[in-house]
Structures are given as structure tokens and as C-alpha cells.
Amino acid sequence: MAHKKGASSSRNGRDSAAQRLGVKRFGGQVVKAGEILVRQRGTHFHPGVNVGRGGDDTLFALAPGAVEFGAKRGRKTVNIVPVARPEA
């Protein structure tokens, strides 16, 4: 078995697609329930009030409101603060 490849051959030339991780909704943005807030590997951000965590550590909104980033016990958290609608 040859261990040297022939001319004009290469063992390189492959790459994997990016995972599109990161913050998807920023502080102050108004979101609906179910919207993805942060895509992450591990818990860089922890779920706070009205925020759920998926099996792949994705954070999503459980209720409509405004996104708020904060910290609790030294951990970065993401909260959803209800937005008061003007009475019509």
C-alpha cells in the first residue's frame, strides 16, 4: 500500500460549517414567548426569570417581554421583564 499520494493530491481541504452560536436577542429587545435568546455550548449564560434552557443549553423566552442581561451569584443570567402595554 502506498503511503505517498500521487501528484496533485492532498489530504487537506476539508472544514466544518460554523455552528452559528452566540446572543440572538440583545438587552432591551422585545421578544415573544419561544424566541431563542442565546445559542451556546455549555452554560455561559444561565436562565433567569421567564427564560428556559433547552437540551443543548440554548436559552429561550418563556413569556413575552424585554430581554435583560444581569448577574446573580457571580453568574451571567438572562431575564425576560414583562412590558406594560398602553391601555387603549
UniProtKB/Swiss-Prot annotation:
GO biological process annotations for this chain's record?
translation
**What keyword terms does UniProt attach to this protein?**
Ribonucleoprotein, Ribosomal protein
Cellular component GO terms, alphabetically?
A: cytosolic large ribosomal subunit
Q: Which InterPro entries match?
A: Ribosomal_bL27, Ribosomal_bL27_CS
Keyword set includes Ribonucleoprotein: yes
Q: Which GO terms describe its molecular function?
A: structural constituent of ribosome
Superkingdom in the source lineage:
Bacteria
Q: Which PANTHER family match?
A: LARGE RIBOSOMAL SUBUNIT PROTEIN BL27M, RIBOSOMAL PROTEIN L27
As for family, the record states: Belongs to the bacterial ribosomal protein bL27 family.
Protein name per its UniProtKB record: Large ribosomal subunit protein bL27
Q: Which organism is it from?
A: Mycolicibacterium smegmatis (strain ATCC 700084 / mc(2)155) (Mycobacterium smegmatis)
